[in-house]
């Protein structure tokens, strides 16, 4: 189906700016953000002082490399509001990513931040071919997860009609797509494939729907998956990138006319690529870990945040800003299961809270059709007074299954095993994860 390919008149001035204009704006905003963090966030004042740097030392964009990194652990160490740079009563909204019982990653937004977020998501939807008056079906989850509300406010900012469906209820999703006739769907790529499967099971030809564009994010997806979705649904499949700690969805987005990697909205987010082992800044085109510094966030500025995503920075094409290549992996052990970030250590903490279970476990990640599945195998504690009857194991499994869903936000199958059933590693690190999902 034809989509509305942007013309030069559709672009914001910053999307057409010269490199000199863009870099001058970035430096101005970077100086403000670094000083804002130093003067208002005790963590940053302490970290800058420990490294012997001061906001006055930032005289060029290259000088940012002198400043310390921020990691997810810093956010958790300052839970819940210790990273905020404004008084709590000035924070209009709080989101939180998945965490254990005590320490999710909390992010805050002022009203201006929410408007900025809506602006970059609106820009992302427009880059994907969306226009005012289009209907956008949002099947990202709503709530503490940033996906649903981030997409929602951006679509409204652009002037679109929003269908706030959220996730799940696949048959209902399809009914509304047929009845409301949306132009755009925003959803995880794996769930889109599930929707297409269900359409075909119901005898519905996906090519006959009103959908023209799918904006897919919250989990990595391959060019092969793009080709499959475009062929099966007759849509343009476009990649949106973001993370809660930096803003949410809308940090970067592909443009419909090129589909050659998400364009980073560099007027709000300054990217670097570093060697994940040494922290050295690498030249554009080199593969390494993606690092972001926010340039305009008021409530919670982040300086040199290590995303752990491995990618490359690519030169501009359809916009004046750089692009990022497809993410090839992560520099840590985080898994993304159906759009939810999960660390093996999170599961380990939940296991260790139950004295009837031993801290011997294995996470198995597979694909069931297009959906990620997680199976947790864990041993009974041999020192605990636990029976070996199947119903007792089943009760322990259900308890852990409930905890994983409640505190991490992902559904899992749990198998409780006899002591020593899980293979031990005698040399090197214990193998905690088996990821059988196909690689591109």
From Swiss-Prot:
Q: Which organism is it from?
A: Aromatoleum evansii (Azoarcus evansii)
User: Could you tell me the superkingdom of the organism this chain comes from?
Assistant: Bacteria
Report a single Gene Ontology molecular function: ATP binding
- Is Cytoplasm given among the entry's keywords? no
User: What role does it play?
Assistant: Catalyzes the activation of phenylacetic acid (PA) to phenylacetyl-CoA (PA-CoA). Involved in the phenylalanine metabolism.
Q: What is this protein called?
A: Phenylacetate-coenzyme A ligase
Establish whether keyword Nucleotide-binding is in the entry.
Answer: yes
Q: How does activity depend on pH?
A: Optimum pH is between 8 and 8.5, with a dramatic drop of activity (55%) at pH 9. Less than 10% activity is observed a pH 6, and half the maximal activity is measured at pH 7.
Q: EC number(s) per UniProt? A: 6.2.1.30
Q: Which family does it belong to?
A: Belongs to the phenylacetyl-CoA ligase family.
The uppermost taxa in this organism's lineage are: Bacteria, Pseudomonadati, Pseudomonadota, Betaproteobacteria, Rhodocyclales
